[in-house]
Design a protein with these regions (language model features):
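Alpha-helical transmembrane segments of multi-pass membrane transport proteins
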Residues: 1-425
Length: 425
């Protein structure tokens, strides 16, 4: 009977059944084989709904979808261009920063490629950058902001990790702060490589004038305060994360619907439905995955995995190397939400056993995922960019390779220099 269930689950996975159904079948089979009541799965679904922090997830997601429906991306690029366009290769640096900020606000790298790609790619080409460089930049920069507040994957990692008792506690705010330096490191390395690559070239600069800065800031006057209000409220203790998410949603609605009038009241319904369909899928997978995690804990799978790994891998450095290889492969094959709900419950106890703090693991996890998004042959952003820019995949492989190598250097530094993530703890 058990073997028949295993075969059915393998067939379900092979034919592309929804992830939640595969996880549900696996958890039910595990509990059935251990003579545990199957009601435990329903209990886990309720437990995840009863998590106050989870309120932030749909609210931040809705805000991101709403921003992507407006002209926020154009105003954001104009602000960055007015401030940094005078630098050598300034437009490329503008693109890096704008993509990182927009991904953080919307929570999805694919949205950044679609929304900013149409704006940045022609601008980079007209600015004198090669087509290969421009395409590679937009494709890879789409995932940079995953480490920056209020990134939805960052919140989701915190929610999952806090459900697992590993003897190390942390707050979501600590997780937000931990992502700042690693993101800045990536931006600095990418910008430095861009400057070196185009040294002595004829890339034109945009003349810096206070008039241009003032005009760009004025156009974006209702959106610029948003991150300062949210971050200031969270870090000062005025807002909890869930309250900050509510403030963000209300602020974005007021700015885009009432002040800018770029999203109509009628459109709010469709944006809400579209964003909540995504959130509903995440919550369904998350609840069932936590039920599956409960079975794994009862069966002592993480402990057995820990013992097995320590038999062959003695040092934390060796574990981190293996972890990076595994996560890069997963990032190329799974979307970030599926990877989080499946792997964090397995990896977190093992990582803590090697002396790795949960906050550091979270930054390593998401940094790997962002590189995995454009890792050949099946990184998700490669397919999105191929469709959006009508480029063959092989051309994108070549275009993204230099950026990938730079980010792998940053990833190694983030992995092996914990203070980059834990300086505030």
């Amino acid at each position: 009977m058990i073997w028949l269930g295993v075969v059915i689950i393998v067939i379900m996975a092979a034919i592309g059944a929804p992830l939640f159904s595969v996880l549900l079948a696996a958890s039910m089979l595990g509990f059935y084989s251990a003579d545990i009541e199957l009601a435990i799965v329903a209990i886990e679904l309720y437990r995840i709904v009863d998590t106050p922090l989870l309120v932030a997830l749909p609210l931040f997601t809705f805000s991101g979808y709403l921003l992507s429906e407006s002209n926020t991306s154009t105003r954001l690029v104009n602000v960055m261009q007015s401030l940094f366009g005078f630098l050598p290769s300034g437009l490329a640096i503008v693109a890096f920063i704008a993509c990182a900020l927009f991904t953080a606000l919307t929570g999805a790298s694919g949205v950044t490629i679609v929304a900013l790609g149409a704006l940045l790619l022609p601008a980079l080409r007209q600015g004198g950058f090669s087509e290969k460089f421009s395409t590679g930049l937009v494709t890879t920069s789409g995932s940079l902001g995953l480490l920056l507040v209020p990134s939805v994957p960052l919140i989701l990692y915190g929610v999952i990790a806090q459900q697992i008792d590993v003897g190390e506690s942390f707050t979501i705010v600590q997780l937000f702060v931990a992502g700042v330096v690693p993101l800045c490191l990536m931006l600095v390395l990418l910008s430095a490589w861009t400057l070196w690559k185009h040294r002595g070239g004829v890339i034109p600069r945009v003349r810096f004038t206070w008039a241009n800065v003032g005009s760009a800031l004025w156009d974006a006057r209702w959106e610029i305060p948003l991150p300062f209000v949210v971050l200031g409220g969270v870090f000062s203790g005025v807002f909890a994360i869930s309250e900050a998410a509510a403030v963000t949603a209300l602020y974005v609605i007021f700015a885009e619907v009432v002040l800018y009038k770029e999203v109509t009241v009628k459109q709010l319904g469709s944006v809400a439905v579209e964003s909540m369909v995504m959130v509903g899928g995440i919550l369904l997978i998350l609840g069932i995955a936590l039920g599956f995690t409960n079975y794994l804990v009862d069966a002592e799978v993480p402990q057995q995995l820990m013992v097995s790994m320590q038999t062959y891998i003695k040092s934390p450095l060796g574990f981190l190397l293996l972890l990076n290889i595994l996560l890069l492969a997963l990032g190329a094959m799974l979307d970030i939400f599926s990877a989080l709900v499946i792997m964090v419950p397995l990896l977190l106890p093992v990582a803590v056993g090697y002396g790795i703090h949960p906050v550091h693991l979270g930054i390593i996890f998401l940094a790997n995922m962002k590189v995995g998004y454009f890792t050949p042959p099946v990184g998700m952003n490669l397919f999105i960019a191929s469709y959006r820019f009508k480029k063959p995949l092989l051309e994108l492989y070549s275009a993204t390779l230099p950026f990938m190598l730079i980010l792998l250097v940053a990833l190694a530094m983030i992995t092996y220099i914990p203070v980059l993530s834990l300086w505030h703890m």
